[in-house]
Amino acid sequence: MELDKETQEKIQELQSYEHTLQNLLMQKQAFQFETNETENAINEVSKSKEEVFKIVGSIMIKTDTEKISKELKQKLEHLSIRLKSIEKQEIELTKKIEELRDEVMKKIK
C-alpha cells in the first residue's frame, strides 16, 4: 500500500514523539529512584543517634545531622518539582501521540 507524503510525515512525527516519550519515561524512572534513595537517607539520618557522614567526591566527611537533613529535604523538594514537570510533559506528549495515531489510522484505512 502506497502512503501519501503527508501520511508518511505524520508517521515519522509519531515515531519521533514516541521516542521522546520513551526518553522522558527513562528520566522519570531515574528521578523516582533518586527520590526513593533520598527519602531513605532522610529516614536513616533522622533515626541515627551516631555521627553522620557525607560523601563528597571520593572522600567521606563528618557532617552535622541538621545540616545534612536540611540538604536532603531541599534535594527532595527539587526532585519533586522535577518529577511534576516530567509528569506534565508525559501527559501532553501522550495526548499528542494518541491524536496523531488516530489521524494516521484514519488515513491508512
Segments the model singles out, each with a brief description of its role:
Residues K10-F31, T35-T38, V45, L72-L100, ...:
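Amphipathic alpha-helical coiled-coil segments
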